[in-house]
Each structure stands twice: as C-alpha cells, then as structure tokens.
Amino acid sequence: LVHSVFPATPQYKWPQLSEASGCEVWVKHENHTPTTAFKVRGGIVLIDALMKSENPPKGLISATIGNHGQSLAFAGKNAGLPVTIVVPEGNNEDQNRAIKSHGATLVIHGHDFEAARQHSLQLQDELGYRAVAPFERELVLGVATYALELFDHVNDLDTVYVPIGMGSGIAGL
C-alpha cells in the first residue's frame, strides 16, 4: 500500500560513520518520503483502513506539534478526506507551513500541546470528525514498513537507533 504512493526509501552504508564508530553503520533515509519523515507511512495505512471501513469518517482531526500532522494531511489529501490539525501557539512555523501545504486546515490554539489537544477534542464534536491519536494500531503498522524495508535490505544488524517522539517509530520496529 505505502509503495503505491511512494517508492521504498533508500538505506546506505556510511563509510565515514562506520570508520568513526568502529562498526558497520547503515542509515535509512526517511527524508525521501513526500513529507520527509517516516510518519507519512502510518497516515497512508490508517486512512486507507478508515476509508474501507463500514463507516468511513467525514474528516479527521488531531493535535500535534510535528510530523504526525503532515502525515495525516498528506494521506487525507490523497484520499479526498478533510483533515484538521491543531497545534499550540509558537509551534514551529516550518511545520505549520508543511501541514498546510499538504492540504490540512491548521488551527493554532493554546499555550502548550495539552491545550491544543483539548481544543482538538472540542472541535471533533463540533465538526463530527474522527480524532486520531499518534500511536493508533494502523498508524504503527504503516510506520513499521520502514523497518521491513531496512531488514529486507540489511539483515544482520546488531543495534538499531530510532528517533523517539510519541513512539510510533520504535513501536513499528
């Protein structure tokens, strides 16, 4: 499913990092996705599952400060599903622009993430949209495709380092 939207991202052995660390180092380039982050994989899989369900949502809403919002925006636009993303005041402007560029309605509310999250729940009721948490099962299944690609290409790894924010990247591993 993910590869119907974009091809597998590359992974390369990095000689300079390998030399500096004293071991073989491979880097998986998730910056080659349409949103420059692995999270988009989860949005694609989640929205596909929701649209195939007995009761597809009329829209999605979520609070975030980053790539989760881009993921839902991109996948929602591809599926023709409206997406509203709520971010707190002072959120990174590059993230805000990216979320909007992928087609989501951006709402800026509250001084911190929790205030933005609470506002998203209020808007969920008003709009009749489905709320999306950043660690839902289908999101994690989609995110896991990065690990599948990596392990299909490099199968003798001792250690894997993964960025951890809300946890979908490590959960997908």
Positions of predicted regions on the chain:
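PLP-dependent amino-acid enzyme catalytic core
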Residues: L1-L173
